[in-house]
């Protein structure tokens, strides 16, 4: 009996709430104007861009088990481009053409040495302590490889196998030569185990 009464009361309230007429407000003194909302840190940022509008920034993200690098526009988050590195990509012919097979590495029979990867930790090159936009590197955690990406064309142009390593996870380029202060750009990429 209690459940039936509660169900009937809920149904009555639900039907009453569906009324299109606004409820009559009691006559009262005019209320003070509502305070303006406090500005937030991202109040001016609009993440929706109309067709033809360009993003302010572009970011590079590792693709994980896809074995590629993603170029994303910011603030929209749109995927602008995929840069295949360690895994074949039939859409652009990566791993299928002779040129890309030469970069990826092949077995004596001409087949690719590896067809799986796990990209992590993308880093760009430096000059004068700032990013110079020349190269980026990304590592393949599964097969102990590192790929270099030319940032003028957004293509992978070199893959290096690291001997005697299994599962290295992080990489970081140097900002300057530690011995010669005249060399103020990236000359090496360090890999952490």
Task: Give the role of each language-model region.
Residues 39-54, 94-132, 171-186:
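Structural signature of eukaryotic scaffold interfaces centered on beta-propeller domains
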Residues 18-28:
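Bacterial lipoprotein signal-peptidase II cleavage site
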Residues 152-193:
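Asp-box/WD-like beta-propeller blade repeats and closely related beta-sheet repeat scaffolds
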Residues 51-62, 70:
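An edge-strand/N-cap motif at the start of beta-rich repeat modules
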Residues 61-64, 130, 136-142, 181-193:
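Conserved beta-strand positions in repeat-built beta-propeller and related beta-rich domains
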Residues 68-105, 138-163:
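Beta-propeller domains
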Residues 1-20:
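N-terminal export signals
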């Amino acid at each position: 009996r209690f459940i039936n009464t509660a169900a009937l009361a809920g149904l009555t309230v639900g039907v009453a709430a569906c009324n299109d007429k606004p409820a009559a407000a009691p006559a009262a003194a005019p209320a003070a104007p509502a305070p303006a909302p406090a500005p937030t840190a991202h109040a001016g940022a609009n993440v929706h861009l109309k067709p033809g509008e360009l993003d302010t920034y572009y970011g590079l993200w590792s693709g994980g088990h896809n074995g590629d690098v993603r170029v994303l526009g910011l603030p929209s988050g749109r995927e602008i481009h995929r840069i295949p590195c360690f895994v074949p990509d039939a859409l652009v012919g990566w791993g299928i053409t002779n040129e890309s097979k030469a970069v990826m590495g092949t077995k004596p029979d001409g087949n690719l040495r590896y067809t799986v990867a796990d990209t992590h930790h993308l880093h760009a090159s430096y000059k004068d302590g700032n990013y110079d936009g020349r190269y980026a590197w990304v590592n393949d955690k599964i097969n102990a490889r590192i790929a270099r990406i030319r940032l003028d064309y957004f293509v992978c142009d070199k893959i290096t196998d690291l001997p005697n390593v299994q599962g290295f996870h992080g990489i970081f380029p140097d900002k300057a030569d530690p011995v010669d202060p005249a060399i103020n750009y990236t000359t090496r990429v360090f890999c952490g185990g």
